[in-house]
């Protein structure tokens, strides 16, 4: 109910917010605070990983992007080793374990958003990722 002045005329206040048409904002999809923090964490780790660690992450990312392809799975199995089972995991191995857990909990649009954020900070790495995914085409 509008406020009324003493002369019984309704008072109207201009909107303080600009009128924005719906669905014209190219911003990324909304995601939970927790998911956004997980992504920030992984991107921070990535910035500090060595070349071989980044290559290992690339293999895992490709395997996640093309899960039905057998070749990435076989390539990942080659990375497994039973030697050193008595030692505790390295920090990098713990980071990969968390990455795997978090990634599995993300929706497809959140996964795509992660790749978009990674591409913003590491375009060369993401270009290698796209090349590796394309290379899996036809390999069953």
From Swiss-Prot:
Localization terms from the record: Mitochondrion
Secretion signal span: none
UniProt xrefs under InterPro entries: DUF4508
A GO CC term assigned to this protein in UniProt: cytosol
Main location: mitochondrion
A Pfam family: DUF4508
Keyword field contains Mitochondrion: yes
UniProt entry keywords in alphabetical sequence: Mitochondrion
Protein name: Uncharacterized protein C14orf119
Organism of this sequence: Homo sapiens
Lineage start: Eukaryota, Metazoa, Chordata, Craniata, Vertebrata
């Amino acid at each position: 109910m509008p406020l009324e002045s003493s002369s019984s005329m309704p008072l109207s206040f201009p909107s303080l917010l600009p009128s924005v048409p719906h669905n014209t904002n190219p911003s990324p999809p909304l995601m939970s605070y927790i998911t956004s923090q997980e992504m920030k964490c992984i991107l921070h780790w990535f910035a500090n990983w060595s070349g071989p660690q980044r290559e290992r992450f690339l293999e895992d990312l490709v395997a996640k992007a093309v899960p039905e392809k057998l070749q990435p799975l076989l390539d990942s199995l080659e990375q497994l080793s039973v030697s050193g089972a008595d030692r505790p995991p390295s920090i990098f191995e713990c980071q990969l374990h968390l990455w795997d857990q978090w990634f599995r909990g993300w929706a497809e649009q959140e996964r795509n958003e992660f790749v978009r954020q990674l591409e913003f900070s590491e375009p060369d790495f993401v270009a290698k990722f796209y090349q590796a995914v394309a290379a899996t085409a036809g390999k069953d």
